[in-house]
Each structure stands twice: as C-alpha cells, then as structure tokens.
C-alpha cells in the first residue's frame, strides 16, 4: 500500500486521495448510463421507458458477478493491509476464473428465459419489444464486464485507485462514440435506436477490459502481486473466498432485484410515469456515484486498517468518511433543488416531460439525506468482513422497502413523485441497522 496511506489515522486528505480517483471513475462510468438515457430520450418515450426496464434487468444479472467482485475486493484489501501481496494475486485470479464461468451460465440462461420473463413483467407491447431487443444485444458484453469488475476489485483493494480514472475516461469516450454512431446511424451505418445503445455499451466494456490488461502489463508490479502469470486453479482457494463473496453476491443481486421490481410497479402506472422515473433514475446516478466513491473507500480502508491491526481506529475512520460524504452530497442536493428542470433537460428535450419530472427529481435528491449515512455505514460493515451480517441488515431494509412500495404503488397507485419516497424508507432503515451493528463491536477479531 502507498506508504502515505498506510497509517492508522487516515486523515481527510488521505481518505480523499483514495476516494477521488474512485469518484472520477464512477462519474465517467455513470456517463455510460447517462448517454444511453440522453440519446434514447431523443428517440422517443417508449425507448426511454424501455431502456429503464432493460438496463435494470441487465443490472440484476450483472450484480451477481459484481457482488462477487466486491467480496473479493474486501479480501484483497485485508491481504494488502497484512502485507501478503502475492495472496492478493491469488484472490484476483480465482475470482476471474469464477466470474468468466459464471458469465457464460448467465448469458445462456438469459437467452432462454428473457422473452418469457419480459412477457410476464411488462404490460406494454411496445416497451416489451424494445426492452427485449436491448437485453439480447447487451448480454454478450457481460463477459467483458465481469472481467473488468475483477480488475477494479484488485486496484481498489490495493488502494491503487488512480488507475480507475484513466480506464473510465477511455470507457466513456468509447461508449459515447459507439452510441452516437449506432443509435442515430452515422458513417453509413443504419440508425439502430435502442439496439444500438446495447451494442455500443458492450463494445465500450470490451475497450475497458483491453485497457486494464494493457495497463496491468505495462505499469503494475506484477511480480509483487502475483500477476506475472495466471495462478494454477485451486478449489480450496476459491472455497476460502466463498464465505465472504457469496454473501456480497447475494446481497447485491437482491438489492438490484428490488430496484427492478420498483420499476415494474411504475411501469403499470403508465408509459409517462415510467419515462419520468427513468429520468429520476438517471439523475439519481449523478449523486449515487459520488456517494459510492465514499462508501467504496470506506469499505476498502476499513478492510486495510483491520489488516494492519488497528481495529480500534475503525469507528473514527468511519466518522471522518461520514462527515466528508455529507458535506459533498448536501451541496449536490442543494443544486438539484435549485435547478431541477436543468437536470431533467439532460435526459429529454420533451417540454411536458421535463415539467412533469420535477417533483420526482426533488424527492429523489432529498432522499440522499438518508441514503448517504445508510450506504457509508453499510459498506463499513462489509469492509469488516462481516458480509453475512451485512446481507441480513440489507435484507431487513429491503423487506421494509418492498412492503412500502407494494402499498403505495401497487395498491394505492399514488403519483410517481410520492413513489420515490420509498428511497427515504430504505436509506433510513439501512442506516439505523448498520449503525447499531457497528456500535455493538461484534465485528471485531473476525478473520477472513
């Protein structure tokens, strides 16, 4: 680990040194979803609404693998803190082997069952056709996305986060270029609409993976971390990762699944409500990436600091990250509340849709007053290695969230802006549960 960071205090400056590159990389990656939404918002309302369903459906599948990589990141962080650098490479290679196999299984299963599942879930024929087209062309990119997730886990776990910024810039530029060409039809190619968005995103993920491979070979100390040659597969190594990785995999999958169900509920309120929620989802991502940079930093620094033997410093570290997070997020919330129509125009140029989106945008932005504390504290729990407990805590929050959504959306069929108050419920419950667990100290002396 960087010697400037390897200390038990982790000042605000050192926290920022880790968080800022993660933030920039996540902002750049968020641009992929933003460009998909912004471009499709200029194709039509059906395409805009369908992309909400299709993107979240894809994310449910992607989060199975991404959740596994988060568990691997926690283990890598612990080994890095302990100074067992070659073991970080073993974790990387075995995680990569597992995710490549998993991607093949998920792609095959989705090809078989996606048409049936979409038919069950979507009531609009136009939305069904467009969403299925997106999913069919987006799935092949999952192989590249899973491999990239393991590279990200390695670089975040070893606190070499500057790499992420460069990768994200390359990925976003590629995605914008591919989408512009394929969605609208340039350089003699046909205008593919929502299908072009899916193909463009998959190609961008391939470019991202190529960048990581080239960068690792050229810049990373591969011998130090055991990346100079592929590790021989050992079932015992993978089994040793599973107690941590399984729970992060399940937790991330269930979390996004409930998000997907939320959009299915909204879809039954009509195509306009779905389009408004997709704008709110896209705008939410702007704040979300900032929050995730701090919460991801919290997870990896907690894991590293425990590996260094400074369990007594964990709570003070978490409090520093909380203060820094709220300072930045509250400033963003204020900007959203002052300029909601400006934010909405990023995603659509339909005047009536811009006006209709404002109430939902305001509710969504203010919900981060709860979500900020919830995510930072929750990722701190995961960073201790208590991933099974973290899963249970989020499960409690998600059950309450789904009950609330079912009542206000499915039964009462309230206005779409009121639907977004569900985010307050989720964030508040998660924050309370995570804080109680961290204060209890039951995570101390946990080995992974």
At which residue positions do the language-model features occur?
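Alpha-helical transmembrane segments and their lipid-water interface positions
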Residues: 29, 33-36, 40, 62-69, ...
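Short alpha-helical transmembrane segments in multi-pass integral membrane proteins
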Residues: 1-19, 76-143, 189-246, 302-367, ...
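Transmembrane helical elements of multi-pass membrane transporters/channels
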Residues: 17-33, 137, 171, 204-208, ...
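Residue-level signal for short hydrophobic patches within transmembrane helices
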Residues: 12-31, 35, 57-64, 101, ...
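Small-residue-rich hydrophobic transmembrane alpha-helices
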Residues: 48-111, 145-159, 163-164, 276-338, ...
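Transmembrane alpha-helix boundary and packing residues in multipass membrane permease domains
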Residues: 22, 26, 38, 74, ...
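Helix-terminus/linker motif at the lipid-water interface of multi-pass membrane proteins
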Residues: 27, 31-49, 118-125, 181-192, ...
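Short runs within selected transmembrane alpha-helices of multi-pass transporters and secretion channels
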Residues: 69, 73, 138-157, 164-175, ...
């Amino acid at each position: 680990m960087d010697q400037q960071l390897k200390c038990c205090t982790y000042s605000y400056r050192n926290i920022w040194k880790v968080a800022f590159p993660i933030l920039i990389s996540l902002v750049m990656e968020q641009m992929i979803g933003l460009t998909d939404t912004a471009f499709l918002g200029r194709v039509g309302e059906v395409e805009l609404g369908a992309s909400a369903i299709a993107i979240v459906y894809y994310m449910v599948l992607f989060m199975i693998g991404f959740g596994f990589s988060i568990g691997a990141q926690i283990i890598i962080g612990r080994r890095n803190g302990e100074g067992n650098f070659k073991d970080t490479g073993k974790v990387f290679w075995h995680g990569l082997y597992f995710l490549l196999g998993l991607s093949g299984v998920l792609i095959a299963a989705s090809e078989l069952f996606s048409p049936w599942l979409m038919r069950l879930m979507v009531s609009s024929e136009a939305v069904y056709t467009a969403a299925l087209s997106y999913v069919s062309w987006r799935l092949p990119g999952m192989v590249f996305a899973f491999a990239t997730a393991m590279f990200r886990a390695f670089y975040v776990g070893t606190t070499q986060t500057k790499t992420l910024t460069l990768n994200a810039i390359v990925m976003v530029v590629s995605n914008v270029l591919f989408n512009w060409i394929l969605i609208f039809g340039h350089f003699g190619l046909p205008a593919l609409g929502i299908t072009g968005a899916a193909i463009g995103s998959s190609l961008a993920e391939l470019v991202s993976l190529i960048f990581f491979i080239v960068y690792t070979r050229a810049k990373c100390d591969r011998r130090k971390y055991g990346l100079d040659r592929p590790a021989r597969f050992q079932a015992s190594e993978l089994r040793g990762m599973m107690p941590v990785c399984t729970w992060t995999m399940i937790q991330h999958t269930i979390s996004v699944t409930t998000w997907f169900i939320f959009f299915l509920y909204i879809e039954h309120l009509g195509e306009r409500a779905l389009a408004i929620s997709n704008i709110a989802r896209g705008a939410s991502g702007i704040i979300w990436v900032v929050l995730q940079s701090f919460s991801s930093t919290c997870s990896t620094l907690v894991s590293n600091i425990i590996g260094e033997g400074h369990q007594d410093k964990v709570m003070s570290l978490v409090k520093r990250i909380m203060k820094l997070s709220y300072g930045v997020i509250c400033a963003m919330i204020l900007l959203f509340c002052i300029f909601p129509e400006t934010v909405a125009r990023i995603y659509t140029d339909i005047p009536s849709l811009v006006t209709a989106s404002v109430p939902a945008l305001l509710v969504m932005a203010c919900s981060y007053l709860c979500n900020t504390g919830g995510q930072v504290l929750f990722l701190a729990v995961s960073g201790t290695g208590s991933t099974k407990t973290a899963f249970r805590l989020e499960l409690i929050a998600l059950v309450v969230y789904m009950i609330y959504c079912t009542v206000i959306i499915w039964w009462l069929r309230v206005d779409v802006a009121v639907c977004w108050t569900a985010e307050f419920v989720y964030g508040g419950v998660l924050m309370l549960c995570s804080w109680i667990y961290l204060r209890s100290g039951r995570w101390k002396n946990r080995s992974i």
